[in-house]
Amino acid sequence: MYKSQYISGHREKFVRLDDTDSRVSMSSNATGMKKRSCFGLFNVTSRGGGKTKNTSKSFREGVKIGSEGLKTIGKSFTSGVTRAVFPEDLRVSEKKIFDPQDKTLLLWNRMFVISCILAVSVDPLFFYLPIVDNSKNCIGIDSKLAVTTTTLRTIIDVFYLTRMALQFRTAYIAPSSRVFGRGELVIDPAKIAERYLTRYFIVDFLAVLPLPQIAVWKFLHGSKGTDVLPTKQALLHIVITQYIPRFVRFIPLTSELKKTAGAFAEGAWAGAAYYLLWYMLASHITGAFWYMLSVERNDTCLRSACKVQPDPKVCVQILYCGSKLMSSRETDWIKSVPDLFKNNCSAKSDESKFNYGIYSQAVSSGIVSSTTFFSKFCYCLWWGLQNLSTLGQGLQTSTYPGEVLFSIAIAVAGLLLFALLIGNMQTYLQSLTVRLEEMRIKRRDSEQWMHHRSLPQNLRERVRRYDQYKWLETRGVDEENIVQSLPKDLRRDIKRHLCLNLVRRVPLFANMDERLLDAICERLKPSLYTESTYIVREGDPVNEMLFIIRGRLESVTTDGGRSGFFNRGLLKEGDFCGEELLTWALDPKAGSNLPSSTRTVKALTEVEAFALEAEELKFVASQFRRLHSRQVQQTFRFYSQQWRTWAACFIQAAWRRHLRRKIAELRRKEEEEEEMDYEDDEYYDDNMGGMVTRSDSSVGSSSTLRSTVFASRFAANALKGHKLRVTESSKSLMNLTKPSEPDFEALDTDDLN
């Protein structure tokens, strides 16, 4: 078995060896070695008789090998093994065999289905060829419509023949290989032809026979006017007979197309239009039958009226246009032929005793005598659609058996069409609103449950708001399950398309490599939050890290190291929360217990975000060590609310310490100046003591001044000590705990090792 593949842009051919081929190749190789060795030895040892001996020996070996080859070929023919390949091998095969699931062939099959629909719709046009010519008082054939109809039928038959030719070159799946997967394709042309000839060839051959064209062309190229009657009857029987193989072939074709392509019409509106087209086609066929049978009943009325004429045979002959007797007015009774049409066989005449039944509307309206095809076609189409839709309830039939059977067929056909076609069309249209109906059912169940559990009104409003917001965002589609059911490679590409640009908007992931971003995108899950929803509360375990895509959130903490501490921040698009989980995931020494949240996060508006769960984040952090980098650490610190709060408090405390040192420096300078002034006063008093005579009054004033200075110095020292004690206590209260972070140095060392 030969197999060809494209390698580096070139087609390479390989050979698959069977057991029989292996035996033949081994024997041939061994023989070849013997021949080479024998020829080599005998050529060296002898030049004469040895050559003749070796030649006869090699001839015997060749005959032996040939007989074994013939036996192998005979076994392969008798075993009946069918050559089968996989569809991938057929694409590079040199044989002109088509894969049944190839896109080009699927397009051909769709076009062939359309051609079958057109063929079924063109065939009823033959029923419009007979016409009652009131101007000539005869029944004739519309020649222009006959040429147009036969041309359309021939074009469709040519396309049908092309389809039949393709059937001989279209592979099929071997039934024995359908155990698993698509199976193997049979590419043997003989097997393909045998399968087609035994299954659908006879049906296709009968359906494509140009019998209506032959009947019409025979009439158009004939010279006898009496050919109108046999042509009319032949068309009626031929079209009805050929409808059977055409419908029989159409049903398996559509089922085969559904197996290979999945569905003929993928969209809901396309499927509804497809079944509506079939309903209109059934109405068209019914209207064409009604027109043809109306002409037949008019013909029956005229033939019955001719029975009372002097020469009934001649009367019947002149009823059809083109008869030679129509031009001779030698007999008196021929002049009374118009009375047959106007009086005896007119649906409007009171003298007519013929009951047309359901065909009276066609005769009285003049449709059977109209030469305008479009108006005639529309009227008959409306009649068929009206009676199929009402199941023939408005039909007033006569006692004629054919008319009664036709009315019964209309009622049964209308019932079947309403059950099948209209039911399928309704199914397609309902698929457009199936999600909306599911949402209504879920909302009703939710309302019943809330009423049963007596939930307060505020909780009910929150539940309704969340359901409404989720419906508006997802339209009832479970996106996560849809994506998870796809293959891993396709799932990764879809996640990358949906999440990559959004993830890159998060500063923490802006500068990471593609592999890490793919791993993060693959594990992100969409989350929706309504207004006033608490995403996480302070002190609760953090089980996911949230990356905001749209909306605004409030982040609040009261853990500031002192009572009454309160810090509030706003989160917007591009921010994240749950950063304690990232610190926990990056720490190789972290336990299984999840970290506690240091902040309370509340949604201020409707929020769309992507969530990364704890285990997924732990896996990404453990698999990709590039996450442990200084740049990530600095970005994380800059955008983390916990680190921002600690940094703000740290800067605030440093600023206060700076202010206290500055105030202390100013106070120290003031005290030094006061001491210098006090020393100057003492020095002045000591120097002036011997020169001035002290009186009691001067001694008293000096001692009073000295006491005042000592008292002010004592008060200043006491106030300074109190301020120092307050400063130390406030310093200890404002000393916030630094947020925990992993040892990046150890991780970097591990990476280097």
Swiss-Prot record:
Query: What InterPro entries does the annotation carry?
Result: cNMP-bd_dom, cNMP-bd_dom_sf, Ion_trans_dom, RmlC-like_jellyroll
Query: Which residues face the membrane's Extracellular side?
Result: 133-145, 221-233, 296-402
- Record's superkingdom? Eukaryota
Q: Where is the composition biased (Acidic residues)?
A: 742-753
Q: Any one cellular component term from GO for this entry? A: plasma membrane
Q: Which PROSITE patterns match?
A: CNMP_BINDING_3, IQ
* Signal sequence segment: none
Which molecular function terms from Gene Ontology are attached? calmodulin binding; cAMP binding; cGMP binding; monoatomic ion channel activity
Ranges for the region named Disordered are 731-753
What is the membrane topology here? Multi-pass membrane protein
Q: Where in the cell is it found?
A: Cell membrane
So where does a nucleoside 3',5'-cyclic phosphate get bound?
A: 508-638
Q: Which residues lie on this side of the membrane: Cytoplasmic?
A: 1-111, 167-199, 255-274, 424-753
The residue ranges of the IQ domain are 644-673
Q: Which UniProt keywords apply?
A: Calmodulin-binding, cAMP, cAMP-binding, Cell membrane, cGMP, cGMP-binding, Ion channel, Ion transport, Ligand-gated ion channel, Membrane, Nucleotide-binding, Transmembrane, Transmembrane helix, Transport
GO annotation terms (biological process): pollen tube growth
Q: Where are the transmembrane segments?
A: 112-132, 146-166, 200-220, 234-254, 275-295, 403-423
Region of interest (Calmodulin-binding), residue spans: 624-639
Quote the subunit structure annotation: Homotetramer or heterotetramer.
Q: What does this protein do?
A: Putative cyclic nucleotide-gated ion channel.
Q: What is known of its domains?
A: The binding of calmodulin to the C-terminus might interfere with cyclic nucleotide binding and thus channel activation.
Instruction: Identify its protein family.
Output: Belongs to the cyclic nucleotide-gated cation channel (TC 1.A.1.5) family.
Q: Provide the protein name.
A: Putative cyclic nucleotide-gated ion channel 8
Report the gene name: CNGC8
